[in-house]
Amino acid sequence: MYLIVEPDSPVPIAQQIHDGIVAGIISGELQDGQPLPSVRRLAVEYGVNPATVKKAYDQLQEDGLVITAARSGTVITRPKRPSAQQREQLREDLRATVWRALAQGFKTDDICATVDDLTVKWE
């Protein structure tokens, strides 16, 4: 698994790890059922605190993208369909982003084109 962790980035390292794994899932680099490195191993590999990796893994689990079991570790799991809670969270996240974009002067067409660009890249 290949992640880019930039210590000087304004994006927290846990978020960078989370987002890198999400990108790997979306791109198909990380497959359903594939184990992730242990928290300790990933922390050593990238020179970060294990608590930082744990935070990223916990968020992935909350997102429904991984499951963690004592014996098998953390494994990629892609839900077949989003839950009602996930759909509502998506709606809330998008609402906040769309409102901010509208307040900044973006037009609806610009916002839709940006969403299209982002999703086409990963489909």
Region spans (language model):
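General helical structural elements
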Residues: 44-45, 58-59, 75, 91, ...
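Contiguous, function-dense segments enriched for cysteine-driven chemistry
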Residues: 12, 20, 44-47, 61, ...
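N-terminal helix-turn-helix
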Residues: 35-67
